[in-house]
Curated annotation (Swiss-Prot):
<dbReference type="GO" id="GO:0022625">
    <property type="term" value="C:cytosolic large ribosomal subunit"/>
</dbReference>
<protein>
    <recommendedName>
        <fullName>Large ribosomal subunit protein uL14</fullName>
    </recommendedName>
</protein>
<comment type="subunit">
    <text>Part of the 50S ribosomal subunit. Forms a cluster with proteins L3 and L19. In the 70S ribosome, L14 and L19 interact and together make contacts with the 16S rRNA in bridges B5 and B8.</text>
</comment>
<comment type="similarity">
    <text>Belongs to the universal ribosomal protein uL14 family.</text>
</comment>
<keyword id="KW-0687">Ribonucleoprotein</keyword>
<keyword id="KW-0694">RNA-binding</keyword>
<keyword id="KW-0699">rRNA-binding</keyword>
<dbReference type="InterPro" id="IPR036853">
    <property type="entry name" value="Ribosomal_uL14_sf"/>
</dbReference>
<dbReference type="GO" id="GO:0006412">
    <property type="term" value="P:translation"/>
</dbReference>
<dbReference type="InterPro" id="IPR019972">
    <property type="entry name" value="Ribosomal_uL14_CS"/>
</dbReference>
<dbReference type="InterPro" id="IPR000218">
    <property type="entry name" value="Ribosomal_uL14"/>
</dbReference>
<dbReference type="Pfam" id="PF00238">
    <property type="entry name" value="Ribosomal_L14"/>
</dbReference>
<dbReference type="InterPro" id="IPR005745">
    <property type="entry name" value="Ribosomal_uL14_bac-type"/>
</dbReference>
<dbReference type="GO" id="GO:0070180">
    <property type="term" value="F:large ribosomal subunit rRNA binding"/>
</dbReference>
<comment type="function">
    <text>Binds to 23S rRNA. Forms part of two intersubunit bridges in the 70S ribosome.</text>
</comment>
<dbReference type="GO" id="GO:0003735">
    <property type="term" value="F:structural constituent of ribosome"/>
</dbReference>
<keyword id="KW-0689">Ribosomal protein</keyword>
Length: 123
């Protein structure tokens, strides 16, 4: 679970390496973000020459969390790091062209099909 001021690694090739969560979207007082939730964030660390620059405000979807997420069958899924993919402001398509590392199956249920199709592995 991620909240305001959480630092998250970026799992795509948009140019950003790390983002800081500003706000969790959805609901009037939603405090924490899990897998598949959209957040507004600022880029804290970026690669030179990338499409995303430092201090830019972006939207991102959470694709991996350290906190275990419970699935309907009773199993849990957890990852070694917190990671997000930067998406376009007007739709749910990623700004990068590649996704690094596995993503959770919950993204398919939340209609992030482009991210699921680009990911090397869906767990």
């Amino acid at each position: 679970m991620l909240q305001q001021e959480s630092r998250v690694r970026v799992a795509d090739n948009s140019g950003a390496r790390e983002i800081l969560v500003i706000r969790v979207l959805g609901g009037s007082v939603k405090r924490s973000a899990g897998i598949g939730d959209v957040v507004v964030a600022t880029v804290k660390e970026a690669a030179p020459g990338g499409t995303v620059k430092e201090n830019e405000i972006v939207r991102a979807v959470i694709v991996r969390t350290k906190k275990p997420t419970r699935r309907p069958d009773g199993s849990y899924i957890a990852f070694d790091e917190n990671a997000a993919v930067i998406i376009k402001a007007n739709d749910n398509d990623p700004r990068g062209t590649r996704i690094f590392g596995p993503v959770a199956r919950e993204l398919r249920e939340k209609k992030f099909m482009k991210i699921v199709s680009l990911a090397p592995e869906v767990l």
